Each structure stands twice: as C-alpha cells, then as structure tokens.
C-alpha cells in the first residue's frame, strides 16, 4: 500500500512546537511574533489564503497585521507602506499576497521588503543565499516539501529528482534546495522535449506545472515518490459540481508509487506552516534567542 505524506498532520505537529516556542520566550521578548500581510485588490482566492494565514497565526500565538488595499492605490503608496513596515519593530515577517493587479511592479515591491522580514523568501538577497547555500529565509512551499520528505525518512541525497515547473515560487527554489541536499535534480517545463520519458526516470517526481491532472501513471516509475504541488477547482460539464484536484491524476498513480501527497491536505498546509516557521525564526533572531527551528529550514 502506498504511503500518504500527510501534510495536514505534520503541519499540526509543527504548529504545536511553534506554540511552545513562543510561550517559552514571551516573558523575555514582551511581545509575540508579528506577521504583516499586504493584499491588493479583490482576488477571491487571495482572500481565502490570507484568512487561512490569519487563522494559522492565531493558533500558534503570532500577531497578524492584515493590510487590505484597494486596487486604486498607486505603486508609490504601497512602497511607502512596505518601507514603514520594514522599520516597525513589532513586525518580524512581511509578505505581499500574490497575485497582485498587473499595474503594479511586483518584483520591485518584493525587492523593497527587508530580507530579514521576507518570510516568503522571494527577495533577491534570499534567493542569492539559497543559490550559495547560505542560511536565510527559504521559500515556504519548497521548504514544506523538503520537511514532508524528511518526516518519512525519504532519502534525497543521490536520488534522481524531477521537478515539473520552473516558477520563482516553487520550481526554481525547490530545485536549488534539493540540489543543496545532494539530490540529482532535473528541472522541466512547458518546452521540455520527451517530458514523459524524463519523469519516468525519477525516484522523486514533483509536479508544480499548474496544469490539472497533467501527470498520470504513464509518467511514473514503480516505487517512485510523487509530490503534487498543484491545486485546481474543476467544474463538472453540467456545472452542478466542483472538486479539487492537483497536477497529478492521483487515483491512476497511487497503485504504482511508494509515497504520494494528497490534494488537498498535502503540500498546502505545509506551505502555511513554513510561513509561521519563518516568522518565528525572524522573531527569535531579532531577540537573539536560541532557535530550535533551524532543522526546519533547508
């Protein structure tokens, strides 16, 4: 029987540790960790994600500061807010909820976030530290995936790993993390020739292409580990029902694999949990506290 990599279960276990970490240090810091989330516009999915982050913060004892800005605001005003939050000592972590409306210069806004508060790990300084394998903020979804693999003692070193997708959020940073952990990494994308053949050579196959049900059993070798990063809401042909699925046709793949992540309940919960880890790590760093979280930051 295939092993389910239960991200929801692992995330709750890590959250318990985070809660205890905050409780044991709050007397010396005199304040909880603080996370600022900047949301621009009315993208409905962003609203759900921000609410999930707010709830997760509350569960472990992080104080969240939500800045919901109308899309009529201009670039300069958002930049001013980021600069203000950079100087706010009650804010340990900050993120720009993506996507944002096209009129904004997304990369410039991210580059303005203090690298020590960049809990999404997207600032170029943190990307550079990842490239050089130096300590720094790590992108949440890739870090969550590494922790899922480690939780079940799945070996990364020396394994053939194929990442389908090259986004700055997942594909690129994840490939670098796995390379730093001595995996033999191949990164593929929409222009890759013979994708199926390449995928079938993988000991660990990670689907982060953003295409529903792209990967079926013909892409996967027997005994592989498959990580599904995608999440999509599909509507039935008569529009009477919707269901969530990932980039992997799981019911087709599960009989062949050693381990897999479900959708939902796999990678998603770990992404939010790693955001909490990064925020608390920044808080501990500011107060020069002994951190027990470094093993969670690949």
Swiss-Prot record:
EC number: 1.5.1.5, 3.5.4.9
CDD domains, per the entry: NAD_bind_m-THF_DH_Cyclohyd
Keywords tagged on the record: Amino-acid biosynthesis, Histidine biosynthesis, Hydrolase, Methionine biosynthesis, Multifunctional enzyme, NADP, One-carbon metabolism, Oxidoreductase, Purine biosynthesis
Entries under SUPFAM superfamilies matching the protein: Aminoacid dehydrogenase-like, N-terminal domain, NAD(P)-binding Rossmann-fold domains
One cellular component (GO) term of this entry: cytosol
Database matches in Pfam families: THF_DHG_CYH (PF00763), THF_DHG_CYH_C (PF02882)
Pathway(s) of this molecule: One-carbon metabolism; tetrahydrofolate interconversion
GO biological process: L-histidine biosynthetic process; methionine biosynthetic process; purine nucleotide biosynthetic process; tetrahydrofolate interconversion
Binding of NADP(+), residues: 165-167, 190, 231
Domain of life: Bacteria
GO molecular function, one term: methenyltetrahydrofolate cyclohydrolase activity
Catalyzed reactions per annotation: (6R)-5,10-methylene-5,6,7,8-tetrahydrofolate + NADP(+) = (6R)-5,10-methenyltetrahydrofolate + NADPH; (6R)-5,10-methenyltetrahydrofolate + H2O = (6R)-10-formyltetrahydrofolate + H(+)
NCBIfam families: PRK14186.1 (NF010783)
Family recorded in the similarity comment: Belongs to the tetrahydrofolate dehydrogenase/cyclohydrolase family.
Oligomeric form and interacting partners: Homodimer.
Function: Catalyzes the oxidation of 5,10-methylenetetrahydrofolate to 5,10-methenyltetrahydrofolate and then the hydrolysis of 5,10-methenyltetrahydrofolate to 10-formyltetrahydrofolate.
Protein name (Swiss-Prot/TrEMBL): Bifunctional protein FolD
């Amino acid at each position: 029987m295939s092993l389910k990599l239960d991200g929801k279960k692992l995330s709750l276990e890590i959250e318990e540790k985070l809660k205890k970490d905050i409780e044991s240090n709050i007397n010396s810091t005199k304040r909880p960790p603080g996370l600022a989330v900047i949301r621009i516009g009315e993208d409905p999915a962003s609203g759900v994600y921000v609410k999930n982050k707010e709830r997760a913060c509350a569960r472990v004892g992080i104080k969240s500061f939500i800045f919901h800005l109308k899309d009529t605001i201009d670039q300069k005003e958002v930049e001013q807010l980021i600069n203000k939050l950079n100087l706010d000592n009650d804010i340990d972590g900050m993120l720009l909820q993506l996507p944002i409306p096209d009129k904004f210069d997304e990369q410039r806004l991210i580059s303005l976030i203090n690298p020590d508060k960049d809990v999404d790990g997207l600032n170029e300084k943190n990307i550079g530290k990842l490239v050089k394998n130096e300590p720094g903020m790590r992108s949440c979804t890739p870090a969550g995936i590494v922790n899922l693999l480690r939780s079940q003692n799945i070996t990364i070193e020396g394994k053939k790993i194929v990442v389908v997708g090259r986004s700055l959020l997942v594909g690129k940073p994840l490939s670098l993390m796995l390379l730093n952990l001595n995996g033999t990494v191949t990164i593929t994308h929409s222009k890759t020739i013979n994708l199926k053949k390449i995928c079938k050579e993988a000991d660990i196959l990670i689907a982060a292409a953003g295409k529903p049900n792209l990967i079926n059993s013909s892409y996967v070798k027997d005994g592989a580990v498959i990580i599904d990063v995608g999440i999509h809401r599909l509507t039935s042909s008569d529009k009477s029902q919707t269901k969530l699925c990932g980039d992997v046709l799981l019911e087709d793949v599960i009989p062949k694999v050693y381990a897999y992540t479900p959708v939902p309940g796999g990678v998603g919960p770990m992404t939010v949990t790693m955001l909490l880890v990064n925020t608390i790590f920044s808080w501990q760093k500011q107060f020069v506290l002994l951190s027990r979280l470094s093993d969670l930051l690949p």
